Regions:
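Catalytic metal- and UDP-sugar-binding loop of GT-A-like glycosyltransferases, i.e.
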Residues: 112
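Active-site-proximal specificity loops/subdomain of glycosyltransferases
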Residues: 52-105
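Charged, glycine/proline-rich intrinsically disordered loops and linkers
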Residues: 81, 142-188
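Short, acidic, metal-binding catalytic loop of nucleotide-sugar glycosyltransferases
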Residues: 32-40
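A glycosyltransferase accessory/donor-loop signature
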Residues: 2-16, 22, 28, 60, ...
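Short internal beta-strands
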Residues: 42-49
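Short aromatic/hydrophobic "clamp" motif used to bind/position activated sugar donors
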Residues: 109
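Conserved donor-nucleotide/metal-binding helix-loop-beta segment in metal-dependent transferases, i.e.
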Residues: 118-159
Length: 337
């Protein structure tokens, strides 16, 4: 994974943008990748809003912490999600290549959101043709749910490691294969179609592509899509922009909410409630007992208590550790653990 000059050819890239609230998640991405023994660099992009305390914490688990500009693309339904106009800030990852202006020369990067927890096999992602990502047309393709809204886990999943997503796509575009353009083009006629999941991308950085995207999203016809029709602007936009070029990534690399079971996953994606959002007390008491949250809690406790105890000097991180201990005591008393 190195060039002849000894510099890494590849990098995992995550983000901390706008404020420090996702700091625990970003730290866990870097820590989990380090535990896998990856030889790729670990890079965290931050915006100017991120505190010095948070940046210093990130340097404990990332090789590089790089400040980038915030990209603002107006969205008519910002009131539903305050971060919607800033989602294209993630496109700064395209500046990390040899032609970029951030001082790096990566040939390929794996882009991970801070709410993804990698488990294993993530270096394999660098072998895939870029762009690559997990086909995520609808949540119902990821998770099977019964009439009462409860998860339905296929009886043979522990043996096969596959479920509904694989039944839908394995015959057409299995892991590592090109996704037909007819599939990714569906986003253009169905705004509810999420396209390629933005929580995990495999990309080849190109500042020319970055500049082209920045120019394109200012065009009125593009702005109508990314500034109104799309709930996930940059994700659905990229699905269409690179339609016909995408390589499919197995959903096991970022199974949604620990579904169907952690033992068959290579990573999990915390959609909705995040394991560090203890201000949502009722929700965290409900979901905190489930295996995906418990694994995140255990890994976080290991990171701040054993491997990087200096992180406990950060008030936010110590408070989270205390909250985790208190929640687990409560769950234990209730017989839920």
């Amino acid at each position: 994974m190195e060039t002849t000059t000894g510099r890494a050819r590849y990098a995992f890239v995550s983000f901390l943008m706008l404020n420090d609230s996702y700091l625990p998640g970003a730290l866990m991405v870097g820590y989990a990748l380090r535990k896998q023994g990856t030889h790729a660099d670990r890079v965290c992009l931050v915006t100017e809003d991120i505190s010095t305390v948070a940046r210093n914490a990130l340097r404990r688990v990332f090789d590089y912490t790089v400040e980038v500009d915030t990209v603002y693309v107006p969205h008519k339904r910002r009131q539903e999600r305050q971060d919607r106009p800033y989602m294209f800030t993630r496109m700064n990852v395209l500046r990390l290549g040899a032609d970029g202006d951030l001082g790096f020369a990566y040939e390929k990067i794996v882009v991970l959101d801070a709410d993804v927890l990698p488990f294993k096999h993530y270096d394999h992602l660098f072998t895939l043709s870029a762009p690559a990502g997990i086909l995520n047309e609808h949540k119902s393709h990821f998770i099977e749910i019964d009439a009462e809204g409860q998860y339905v886990v296929p009886q043979d999943v522990e043996m096969t490691g596959t479920w509904k997503w694989h039944r839908l796509y394995d015959s057409v575009c299995p892991h590592g294969h090109r996704i037909p353009k007819t599939i990714t083009d569906r986003v253009s006629t169905d705004p509810l179609n999420l396209g390629i999941n933005g929580g995990l991308f495999v990309l080849e950085p190109s500042i020319c592509e970055y500049r082209a995207i920045m120019e394109d999203v200012r065009r009125p016809e593009t702005l109508e899509m990314v500034g109104d029709l799309f709930d996930w602007p940059e994700m659905q936009y990229l699905t269409l922009r690179w339609s016909g070029q995408w390589t499919n990534v197995d959903v096991r690399f970022a199974g949604l909410n620990g579904y169907p079971m952690l033992s068959v996953l290579y990573g999990t994606h915390f959609g909705g409630l995040k394991p560090w959002q203890f201000k949502r007390e009722k929700a965290i008491r409900r979901w905190g007992r489930y295996p995906d949250f418990q694994v995140w809690f255990a890994e976080y406790t290991e990171m701040v208590s054993e491997v990087h105890p200096d992180l406990r000097k950060v008030r936010r991180l110590q408070r989270l550790l205390d909250d985790i201990h208190e929640l687990n005591r409560h769950l234990g008393d209730e017989g839920l653990l």
